[in-house]
Amino acid sequence: MSTKPVLPDLLALFTPLFDQCTPDEQRILLAVLERLAAEHYRRWAEGLSDPAQKRDFLAAAAREEHIAAVLEGLGPRAEHLARTVWQRFPHLRTLYADAIQPLSREEQWKVQSIGEHGGAELLRSFAAAEVNPDGRAKLLVCAAEDEENAQLLAEVLKTMGAQ
């Protein structure tokens, strides 16, 4: 009898961190998480033999970096806030990595896909609170990029038969 592994609940993992942040810090925290996700996409790409998949994963990493840059660009003190976030949460880099480390690559992708949907939802909530129309539009584009990454992972998993 095989048992399905329990996948980490990213909402439970990261909500307490967001709860400790001001709204401006929340954007920067998400930017940090997007950059960390980009690192994972690049690492996964290194392990892929299919050139098209490798290209797609590197494109996903680029989207994550773009989202982070947009989030950082929406406020004047991004660098200061990033230092604050890293000081408050020095374990941030390992928190997610440790949560997915025992999982297979496909399970990691499933968790990441769920995380992408959560990131998109958070970006849409930031957009709803944004008073600047240009900033709101940028955040909605970023939400679509997170959804695009979730879709990529879902398609790869479907192709592999590992939904």
Regions of interest found by a model, annotated:
Residues S2-Q163:
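Non-heme di-metal
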